[in-house]
Amino acid sequence: MLKVGIVGGTGYTGVELLRLLAQHPQVEVAVITSRSEAGVKVADMYPNLRGHYDGLAFSVPDSAVLGSCDVVFFATPHGVAHALAGELLAAGTRVIDLSADFRLQDAEEWARWYGQPHGAPELLPEAVYGLPEVNRERIRSARLIAVPGCYPTATQLGFLPLLESGLADNARLIADCKSGVSGAGRGAKVGSLFCEASESMMAYAVKGHRHLPEISQGLRRAAGGEVGLTFVPHLTPMIRGIHATLYASVADRSVDLQALYEKRYASEPFVDVMPAGSHPETRSVRGANVCRIAVHRPQGGDLVVVLSVIDNLVKGASGQAVQNMNILFGLDERLGLAHAALLP
């Protein structure tokens, strides 16, 4: 059994992590921390977890206790993992960070986007970007894993086959993405109130979203060079889900794009390339660690449209974190994650 610790268990990614790990046969959650909720039982805060964590209570973070775990997940705001990750790594504990702290390889770029100096730049060279469909082999031997963000996961998985094959015009990529309100976190915000978010949709951060440099970094790796990306996120009146509509110019009309995508993801347990002509729905991935993709070439022209959907809390966060843990410790990648999506 793997002894697991969780730092920051009171947000949506934290409770989703608890839900997924409760179904995992090789895991014992030994400690979960929250300074504000120390002493509160997990099952009292989250009634859906009654019968799974009845003896577990939130506690103040203690490096010695966390350092006794095989792996510690950080489900925290950015900046928190900077302070603790190095100490845990020195104790021999593996770290899987769901925040943005180690996703960008350039500390100065991270500081520009997150408005504060990077707190552990010395750890960036060894941080492995935890997108299994790209970095599976590096994940196996990692000490520190940076779990990708929700928008970056859906966008990169949608674009990868076109960029890796050299088919797309890398200078003119567009990602038009929609997110459920849970992507804004559990904290009280006016824009997340029911009366504000219901029956309305809006674009935001068009000038520049924090996920833009992360997406661009991944697409550059796939393309082997610079890319030009326009990324426009939207907030939609649903709780869970990311729907990415991706546009790329592909001049070669002789390529069988359906076959290209099917071949690229044939061995990937959590990427579903849907039949030609499909339109994946966010409800088809709700609660599941899967990305569903459909590729289109409207009117047979040069513009290719890729539709990519995920659950932002699962494949876009906690589910992908568990997938990384499974790979890291040599377990079946599907362990604890094989359940179907919820309908309706």
From Swiss-Prot:
SUPFAM superfamilies: Glyceraldehyde-3-phosphate dehydrogenase-like, C-terminal domain, NAD(P)-binding Rossmann-fold domains
One GO location term (cellular component): cytoplasm
Protein's pathway: Amino-acid biosynthesis; L-arginine biosynthesis; N(2)-acetyl-L-ornithine from L-glutamate: step 3/4
Keyword NADP listed: yes
Compartmental location: Cytoplasm
GO terms of molecular function: N-acetyl-gamma-glutamyl-phosphate reductase activity; NAD binding; NADP+ binding
EC number: 1.2.1.38
EC supergroup of this enzyme: oxidoreductase
Catalytic activity: N-acetyl-L-glutamate 5-semialdehyde + phosphate + NADP(+) = N-acetyl-L-glutamyl 5-phosphate + NADPH + H(+)
Matches recorded under CDD domains: AGPR_1_C (cd23934), AGPR_1_N (cd17895)
Active site: residue positions: C150
General function of this protein: Catalyzes the NADPH-dependent reduction of N-acetyl-5-glutamyl phosphate to yield N-acetyl-L-glutamate 5-semialdehyde.
Family, per entry: Belongs to the NAGSA dehydrogenase family. Type 1 subfamily.
The protein's name: N-acetyl-gamma-glutamyl-phosphate reductase
Native source organism of the sequence: Azotobacter vinelandii (strain DJ / ATCC BAA-1303)
Lineage: Bacteria, Pseudomonadati, Pseudomonadota, Gammaproteobacteria, Pseudomonadales
